[in-house]
Amino acid sequence: HSQNNCLPVMACRPAPVQISGIGYINTTGLPMVDYFLTDEICMPSVYDKGGFTETPLRLPHCHLCYQPETMREIKSVGHNAPAMERGYVTFGSFNSFAKVTDEMLVQWRNILQAVPNSKLVIKCKICSVPSGQEMVRQRFKRLGGNPDVLELRPFSPDYLTQYGDIDIVLDTAPYNGGLTTCDALYMGVPVIALRGKTHGSRYGASILTAAGVPELIAENLREYTGKAVQLAKNGMLLNRLHRELPEQVRNSRLMDGKGYMQELEEAYRQIWALYCQQG
């Protein structure tokens, strides 16, 4: 149901067993799609199917494997947090602004008000035009925020290097970031994510767990705000994360291509065996 999808092809069932997953976080609604790829954090076994027509195909670890170096030449290295030199904390969000709810903007407002002199960089396609930037500023102002603390940046191909300007990334909810969260961690920037009750709202928790930083997961809005403020005020911890995260992420489950493929292929074997038994 997203742009340029292949649902008409899937509806013709070109394969005897069909799976949807990664990139699209909801059900297809097609009975021809048998499974939905997920994991034990995004869709725990204790949960029901939650409206999915597909059977959950759960991997024991994150159902996403992040392999940026196969697509980009940039290499991440540890560095000091920007706040160490600037003297103030810069929060950031590089997600699509369509994911930013009023409820989340209010939390960002509260975080900025609790951290003196802090700024928020919002980088997205809508900020590529003056009318889009004005909409963002007016919306933030309507919710009680000070638009002067916002730095609005347009989408650009060098977005990875721009993480070097960010101290802490604030994830969106209930539609979490996926690739943007991975990118931030890879570039050494901690991400505060809120765990919800659906696959799409638990994506951030799955990624952060796989990256080895589950302490950055918040279970409610108050904790989300609290974790962001506490980290912003703990310069030693913030700087340590910036210096150590790149190597930690490269050695984590999130980027373990071999381990990921072993788990995925085992899942394939199980559902194929089941198909053959039922065939």
Where do the language-model regions lie?
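Catalytic binding pocket for nucleotide-activated donors in carbohydrate/polymer assembly enzymes
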Residues: 163-164, 168, 172-257
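A short acidic, amphipathic alpha-helical/loop segment
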Residues: 5-9, 107-110, 180-183
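C-terminal amphipathic helix plus adjacent low-complexity
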Residues: 95-97, 110, 123-143, 226-279
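Acidic, amphipathic alpha-helical patches
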Residues: 6, 156-159, 181, 204
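Active-site-proximal region of nucleotide-activated glycan assembly enzymes
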Residues: 12-77
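Conserved catalytic-core segment of nucleotide-activated headgroup transferases in glycan assembly
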Residues: 62-156, 162-164
